[in-house]
């Protein structure tokens, strides 16, 4: 049995339980709600992996799971949403690994088994999370010698965009699911639904202007926060894939189509 066949067999065993758990997590988003306890771990799913500690420039230790590909696959770094921890997205990592990508997952400070951090729940994000991605991306680039692809989920799209503004690390491609094009507009939409969210102290809101990085935007058609009209117009190298589902739930509703769409996008033209 090949590596991919083994991985697919494992995913089929766990799919029902993970779908139920993740739908609950997704519904509780729109506030920073980290969880220190992993519901799913690579050991529990019997995955090939290594657990790594990556240190940031400001002295924080981050927990990282590396799910290596069977061959020299393209590295992808997943920046998660604002709730739970990377264990909630391990099923996604498993699928991407099974399809040949070199997967890197990490917890922001205050999430999972990364260092403690004073979380302000009703804040859109913490700028320190961008520092976390700085450290992980630098580690992955130095370790693999390849320009990593980046994937951001909901709040993670903010982290990726803020990172792109300041990094000198070469980036392969970018995948956004639950895209936050304009943080100020995102806060307005949340307020219209009774949720008060603030910016980090000293944060200067600017509508994102994409660097020349080829990007895939995954859009959930029933999402009332991240909508297709938010996607930058006229951007070269822009790809859009839609799913009939709610906010950042495309993978859990359509795992095969979601995964193959990402893998095809990353591997195309490399």
Model feature map: region roles:
Residues 224-230:
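Conserved alpha/beta-hydrolase "acid-adjacent" motif
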